Amino acid sequence: MKLHGRGVHLFSQFVGSLVFLAVFQDQGRRMNIDLSTLAPTQVYHLMTQTVIPRPIAWVLTDSGEQNFNLAPFSYFTAVSSRPPLLMISVGKKPNGDIKDTTRNALETGKLVIHIAPSDLADKVTLSSATLEHGESELETTQLETVDFQGFELPRLEGAPIAFGCKLHEVIEMGETPQSLIFAEIEHIYVDERVISMEGDRLKVDALAVDPLARLGGNEYATLEKTFSVARPK
């Protein structure tokens, strides 16, 4: 039997699954997994179930003439405060083209990164669908934007935190490759209902923000509770 194209790909995944299960059965509950034995999709699924919880960057960019693109990314973190940088890892479309978020950021140099509340989980998920370039997720999600004071792009209404950013750098990484987007924060919007003052510092109430967090598969998480531990002096 000869396999071609997608058949070879599926067969390779099947063999990889058998190897993974064999390792699991051999070691029982004490898993020590050699990633070189896994298929790329298995590595992805394992990473997204173990690097948890992950914050979600809900990114708005301009496709041109106020036609806004919106997409969520959970390979996302803060990397520096001087300069104030955020990093988002963006993959490719199924056909191998760069995603609109990357394309728009490169062309306009601007993006707005939102922290989505848990009650917008359905909208976040819906905005992850692949659309044709120029189609807007704002239409499919029926979300509204409002003016982002002091920044060129608008922000999403209903998101308690928004970062107005300029593009700092894009680095291509890996075999796919992924686009690592480094965005420098120029303006921050915080809903006044989630902030208070502690001396000369602003304090953001994390439970009031109620940020949506990403787990593996289709699963999300919420904070539910916070606690403090004093740092050593």
Residue ranges and their predicted role:
Residues 4, 9, 13, 25-27:
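Low-complexity, intrinsically disordered or signal/transmembrane-proximal segments
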Residues 16-30:
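Short, Lys/Arg-enriched N-terminal segments with co-localized hydrophobic residues
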Residues 28-233:
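Basic, polyanion-binding surface patches
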Residues 8-10, 19, 202, 220:
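Polar low-complexity intrinsically disordered regions enriched in Ser/Thr and small residues
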